[in-house]
């Protein structure tokens, strides 16, 4: 199959150690008409000692904790992060190309194959596993791919007899903030994630893609109609339900950058729709006992909330959920028990009906964007619905959440699996379990 051949080629690109010399890089820069750029860590100007290119073994940069160049994520202005510390290249690629067309990607692939240089692909850089970087690699940065187009009746290429649907095409450099604003202006709803700077056509969609509305309308991969991609053999391909079907299946779940570089993604959109929002929180000084009671209430309500279409974030002492299925009265009834509990314990409650998803996005997500950052331990636990269906399963969940709180952690879950989505299973390459998970 085409996809298995391409995967073999691309794995070689990703795992190569890199043998390119100065002459090779100069030749590539000439081929690209001067568009090859040297990459240095963002924070390097803050450091008095910059040794960005002293490391000769790329694996040392990737694994040695001292080979980094970081500011304090919680306070980027703090001088303590770089006082008496040397800045090193770390996992930042040696060189990068600001990709503006398919031709630049093809030239990069040809160079990588000839010199055995690793390729890293960066959209917005939101990759928990760091795959958008790579010591010694040639980085393909797709931010300049800024296509943004709305079509009221889109038909995928070579699907001439298929009925058209409303769709938006996003270049690989478009982020959610851009496409949400664009969709709002067109009077439609684009279904994506909650991070405004996350790319709409990158790793988010190719690893499944979930968000507030996924409960009802499916994952990002369920909504993709067509990809334009440069595969590692240097060919620009259109992948949809009518051509390159195996590649289309694989791109929807196979992970960001696995089969090539996405140039654009065309995604089905929905009409403008109202959304009920519940933002319920306990005070910051809430006791462990009250937090445990909150957790118990949430665990016992999870399946009901999922069936009502509520999607979003559920945490210890805080819930921010939205659903397009309920009226205001229905939403208040659905969340009544949690709301009453929060009020009894000095918490805040806001249950409201907003005119569309964009209003929820601008009111609750944009306003809570942090300038810095904080420590986060993420994991990929997917909790099946059956864990909530019996007392033993609920107790195990309760015990684990209570333990996390007791050791100073603030546990939270993304309640964004497609619990009530009615799409056909296994039309794409995502994990089967997405379809029957409670959380």
UniProtKB/Swiss-Prot annotation:
FAD-linked oxidoreductase; part of the gene cluster that mediates the biosynthesis of the mycotoxins phomacins, leucine-derived cytochalasans with potent actin polymerization-inhibitory activities and monocot-specific antigerminative activities. The first step in the pathway is catalyzed by the hybrid PKS-NRPS phmA, assisted by the enoyl reductase phmE, that are responsible for fusion of the leucine precursor and the polyketide backbone to produce a 2-pyrrolidone intermediate. Pathway: Mycotoxin biosynthesis. Residues 1-19 form the signal peptide. Glycans are attached at residues 29, 84, 285, 300. Keywords: FAD, Flavoprotein, Glycoprotein, Oxidoreductase, Signal, Virulence. Its EC number is 1.-.-.-. Belongs to the oxygen-dependent FAD-linked oxidoreductase family. It holds the Pfam family FAD_binding_4. This is FAD-linked oxidoreductase phmC. It is an enzyme of class 1 (oxidoreductase). The gene is phmC. It comes from the Eukaryota. One of its GO terms (molecular function) is FAD binding. Its cofactor is FAD. The keyword Translocase does not apply. Coiled coil: none annotated. Residues 89-272 form the FAD-binding PCMH-type domain.
